[in-house]
């Protein structure tokens, strides 16, 4: 694995809400990370302009809005995301087969087999555990539920999933090697676990076979963010040899 290939695995969670911060972080980190994750707070505050600014600075975008609605609404929102030129965007697998399949059908009709952003299905949020599922009436262990949702997403034609690193081996076994897996819940050894309950280090996550790692505060809160990003890349390369 080259350094560029290792860098491509790193998605920086751009958890800001001011447009000036978007420009600052994109300009600083575009050469040092593979992608920037734009979530609900930033997109609600700044809209598509945040995506365009990152792209202007040479960065790729993971639009993390987790669509979950009736099938046509999600399909149309996904189409607009793809038209923005983002590399990844997502929806909730819990929205069901019809919602996911309609989205893929709509994208395929628009892009006619051409290159487009990859659509991912969120399985179970990394802040969730067995008790969280039981509280909403799901009496299935987290790993089993994650695999169930991943298989449903694959059946619907979705390109991959967002899942905790602990479930990556199970998803790989169930869904195959050509199914993208993006994992949050990744924290270098020097960082705290924050609000995510199912976590791993970057080295551990890559070792399990994750394609992309979402990392935010360990880079953003570091005294020297560029050095923190490069240290994570070093760790990924060490794992791969």
UniProtKB/Swiss-Prot annotation:
It catalyses: orotidine 5'-phosphate + H(+) = UMP + CO2. Substrate binds at residues 15, 37, 64-73, 126, 187, 196, 216-217. Homodimer. Keywords: Decarboxylase, Lyase, Pyrimidine biosynthesis. Catalyzes the decarboxylation of orotidine 5'-monophosphate (OMP) to uridine 5'-monophosphate (UMP). Pfam families: OMPdecase. The active site is at residue 66. This is Orotidine 5'-phosphate decarboxylase. InterPro entries: Aldolase_TIM, OMPdecase, OMPdecase_AS, OMPdecase_bac, OMPdeCOase_dom, RibuloseP-bd_barrel. The gene is pyrF. Its EC number is 4.1.1.23.
């Amino acid at each position: 694995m080259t350094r560029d290939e290792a860098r491509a695995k790193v998605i920086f969670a751009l958890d800001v809400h001011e447009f000036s911060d978007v420009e600052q972080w994109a300009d600083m980190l575009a050469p040092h990370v593979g992608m920037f994750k734009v979530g609900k707070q930033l997109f609600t505050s700044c809209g598509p302009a945040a995506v365009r600014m990152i792209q202007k600075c040479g960065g790729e975008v993971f639009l993390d809005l987790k669509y979950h609605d009736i099938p046509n609404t999600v399909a149309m929102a996904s189409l607009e995301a793809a038209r923005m030129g983002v590399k990844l965007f997502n929806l909730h697998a819990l929205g069901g087969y019809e919602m996911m399949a309609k989205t893929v059908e709509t994208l395929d009709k628009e892009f006619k087999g051409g290159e487009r952003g990859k659509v991912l299905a969120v399985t179970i949020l990394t802040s969730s555990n067995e008790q969280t599922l039981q509280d909403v009436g799901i009496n299935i262990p987290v790993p089993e539920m994650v695999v169930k949702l991943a298989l449903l997403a694959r059946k619907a034609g979705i390109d991959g999933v967002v899942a905790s690193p602990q479930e990556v081996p199970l998803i790989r076994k169930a869904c195959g090697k050509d199914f993208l897996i993006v994992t949050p819940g990744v924290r270098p050894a020097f960082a705290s676990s924050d609000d995510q309950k199912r976590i791993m280090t970057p080295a551990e996550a890559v070792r399990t076979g994750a394609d992309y790692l979402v990392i935010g505060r360990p880079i953003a809160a570091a005294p020297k963010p560029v050095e923190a990003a490069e240290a994570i890349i070093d760790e990924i390369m060490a794992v791969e040899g």
